[in-house]
Amino acid sequence: MKAQFSQGTLKRLSMMRESEGSQSRSKRPFIVLGTLVGIFFASTAVLAVILGLKSKAAQKNVDNELCVTPYCVKAANYLIESLDETVEPCEDFYHFVCGAWIKNSRIPDDADSINTFSTLRTQLDYNVVDILTQPPSNDTAEPTALDNARILYNSCVNEQNIEDEGTDTILSIVNNELGGWPILEGSSWDNSTFNLFDLLLKLRKYNNDIIFGIGTSVDEKNSQQYDLVIGQSDIGLGQRQYYSNESKITVAYREFIRDLAKELSDNTSMVDTDVNDIFAFEKEIAKHYWTTEERRGRPNATIRTTVGSLTDLLKTSFDFSTYLRSAYAWSGVTLDDSDVVTVHELEYLNNVSSIIDQTSARLLQNYIVWRFMMHRVDNMPKRFRSIKENFQHIFRGTTSDVSRKIICGNFVNGNMGFAVSALYIKKYFDDNARIQSSEMIGNIRKSFSDMIEKSSWMDEASRKKAIEKAEAIDEKIGYPDYLAGDNMTQLETQYADYKFTSSYINNVLKLIQIKAKEEFQILRKTVDRKAWGFTAPTVVNAFYAPSKNQISIFWFSYLSSSIFLFIAFPAGILQMPFFDRDAPKYLNYGGIGVVVGHEITHGFDNSGRQFDKDGNRIPWWTKETVQEFNERKTCIVDQYSNFTVPNINMKANGNQTQGEDIADNGGLRESFFAYQKWAQANPNADKKLPGLSKYTPEQMFFINYAHTWCSKMTDSYAMNRVLSDVHSLGQFRVIGPTSNFVEFDRVFKCQPGQGNSRVKKCIVW
């Protein structure tokens, strides 16, 4: 563009030219020089004006391209503070996005980790406490269920009353109902009245599954009804691997038992011997305990039988058939011989039954009552809780205790979540989130169907059924509708028995018996495929359940369920950095969008693929398609099994995490393609974030995705995650999917073979 001079400048130049003739010849060189200098400075000044105008115009254009809403400013801030731009994104995208966040974040003393989810959960925790501590509203009538939730909370935080009540109630149950705890009585304990069957039955009424687990679940072969389930229960340290070698954790576990026994009794004559025997017995049981990997890796190892045929199947001295009948009869449910029973971990049941047959009455009584007391310590005075907290510090790697009000808020929310949610959604939830989330789910579902349509490894019949299943997925967003209305009849009915007093220990004992009865009584109910389910909106997670083919988005949650075929997104997850109604869509699709895709993909992972669109576990893929799927799945398993966990030098377990890894990879691809389509239909609608304008919208999609997985954890917690969690660590949830995605390579101009770009991409969906 040519320089444009003002009229004043042009006039001055003309006057200089007219005066040249009247000057003497001797002064002409100086005049010419002066004129040239003047022209130079004038031109420079004009050029400065021009450049200034251009700069202002350019700045105005930049400003028009920026999103400067409060949310965008906040989002820009958290992302800028997270990025480490000294790291090459094509070499290590996780540390490129999370490097500064990791450096500057500090794990709270009372926590074993910090990440995006824990930050949201912390906010939820305080919101719940606020709801439970605020006085009832004078303007509107609040449900009685919420009043009872507040009573339960107040009994939990009333430390003085807990101290005054002491341990009399718990010890009365132990001594008068359960037959005593031998470790407290030394050699005076009388074993003549010991009855394993009666002991386990009494504890099951307190919602304790010890050694053997029983309960109710959706029938995998007929998703319209419930059936009975039998299998292994849990073990004290959670996973078999902890018992393999002596460690600071096994030492701390024995100290937990020993210190509790000594605090409860002055008779310490046999404490050390009993503690060692209890641990040795549990260690023996643990040898037969199925790990998370083994349970997920043997989906067809379950056996379907009936109550009448159960004894013939198990052939153990422990009468499981009578045990089931007695437990359900306590809740008012009479079992028939024809009632279906799904048996899990059959080898465990047989092997542990044989161990029990060779174990003394004293040891069985000691172990079983210990497992009851292990949980009831939480409801006892502070000096007893401190014993468990000392163990937790070693097991989790923490250095201080969670505040009492947060513990109590979580306890009430975990047991009366829908009552808490009734007020939570009115106070904290934006209904626009439901509308926008529903639209995104539709777009991402369509994206997944398109991916199925283009999959070359599926035969036509399997592909058609897969698309039908994807289109049939039911979705739950935010909260059930009845919580938002004025009619609280359904809520009041749900919590009709939840009436409490000022006695915390008695409230807890009543509550766990209610929960036990509810699980048994649901057996005779019909499965409501459209119902919200059992998870309240006040959680931070999302869910997919195969036997309902349903997805749910709540305000606070991100899990997966193998019971119902639906996906759930509770209210708690629909906020920054996952979602905001004012956010550019590349942030929402990179956040909650990937979560949506993740949950949809669960319907087609190694477990979900075995359920049809109606939620029944039946073969609906051809053998050829199953073989093709397994080859692609193996690629994912091998890839993730080669990841090494920093600091603890452990390999990730790709077999254990395969379902979640498949969902992570598919979810990222689905959401990205859905965002691409949205962006094509809405050109230039997404503005850039201040301070991050050098990144394209597609790059920002991946950056926000990775940011949701920034995490930091103690070594103890990292080991626990590797041993037991079906989810990969955050670092691998970023590196794995992005390194398999050619669109990531294109967006960041990566070359296959670089650190964050695999040459051989592992692609299932």
Describe these PLM feature segments.
Residues 28-65:
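Alpha-helical transmembrane segments in eukaryotic/viral proteins
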Residues 82-104, 242-262, 457-460, 658, ...:
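Hydrophobic/aromatic-rich, well-ordered segments within soluble, folded domains that form packed cores
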Residues 67, 71-72, 88-91, 96-168:
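Active-site-surrounding "flap" and adjacent substrate/cofactor-binding loops of secreted or lumenal enzymes
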Residues 127-443, 480-483, 492-519:
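Noncatalytic, helix-rich "gating/capping" subdomain that lines the substrate-entry/channel surface
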Residues 51-53, 121, 278, 284, ...:
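Intrinsically disordered, low-complexity linker/terminal regions across diverse proteins
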Residues 20-24, 77-84, 106-108, 188:
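Asp/Glu-centered strand-loop micro-motifs enriched in Gly/Pro and often flanked by an aromatic residue
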Residues 55, 59-81:
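Short, Gly/Pro- and small/polar-rich lid/capping loops
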Residues 3-42, 252:
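Helix-loop boundary elements of multi-pass alpha-helical membrane proteins
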